[in-house]
């Protein structure tokens, strides 16, 4: 079913079990984040970390997908976004399980003793270029605040041996990110190439890395079928979240 009906209200996005206000966040709720939150492997996880939490979307999606015993830490550098994430989480069914931290992840990590089974991030990927309208949007879009080597290092410092570190990136940038991760000792375990329809080349890639070596499973996801409605595969992946699916 095509999500033609608007699910925007009060400058946010309504899902089946929660609402995400994002009017004070530089980066809004979008398909990339929804894909990542629905795709990341959660079987057996006990502790999750969301790096660059923004509006809290990924933390909320993980909370919906996991048991009541799972604790989620959401770290966001920008204070307005972190405050809005906290408000979104407070209004959700999982407020007691999600901890929002207004902090620089590189500093926050050094103070942690716990390790995470699942680390998730929808990271910046633009190199410095065209000036953004606000410093907050520039921070969210560009890798100047947290570049990819630093992101991979942060994840490596706090992941369990069998844990997964999951990201979503544009296809070509994802290929470069994979090369970098492999050179730093990570192992690629899951890869899903995402295309808008069968006729188009993949434009996004979902990646799951682990410190532990193992077989890499790869597949392809097409978002829309020939009729321009959501494909069966995309519907199966996201229907627990989309309000009109």
Swiss-Prot record:
Source superkingdom: Bacteria
Reaction it catalyzes: adenosine(37) in tRNA1(Val) + S-adenosyl-L-methionine = N(6)-methyladenosine(37) in tRNA1(Val) + S-adenosyl-L-homocysteine + H(+)
InterPro entries the record matches: DNA_methylase_N6_adenine_CS (IPR002052), SAM-dependent_MTases_sf (IPR029063), Small_mtfrase_dom (IPR007848), tRNA_Adenine-N(6)_MTase (IPR050210), tRNA_adenine-N6_MeTrfase (IPR022882)
Stored SUPFAM superfamilies: S-adenosyl-L-methionine-dependent methyltransferases (SSF53335)
EC number per UniProt: 2.1.1.223
Swiss-Prot/TrEMBL keywords: Cytoplasm, Methyltransferase, S-adenosyl-L-methionine, Transferase, tRNA processing
GO cellular component: cytoplasm
tRNA processing is among the record's keywords: yes
Single GO MF annotation: nucleic acid binding
Localization in the cell: Cytoplasm
PROSITE patterns the record matches: N6_MTASE (PS00092)
GO biological process, one term: methylation
PANTHER family from the UniProt entry: TRNA1(VAL) (ADENINE(37)-N6)-METHYLTRANSFERASE
UniProt-listed NCBIfam families: tRm6a37MtseTrmN
Family named by the database record: Belongs to the methyltransferase superfamily. tRNA (adenine-N(6)-)-methyltransferase family.
Function: Specifically methylates the adenine in position 37 of tRNA(1)(Val) (anticodon cmo5UAC).
Name of the molecule in the record: tRNA1(Val) (adenine(37)-N6)-methyltransferase
Gene: yfiC
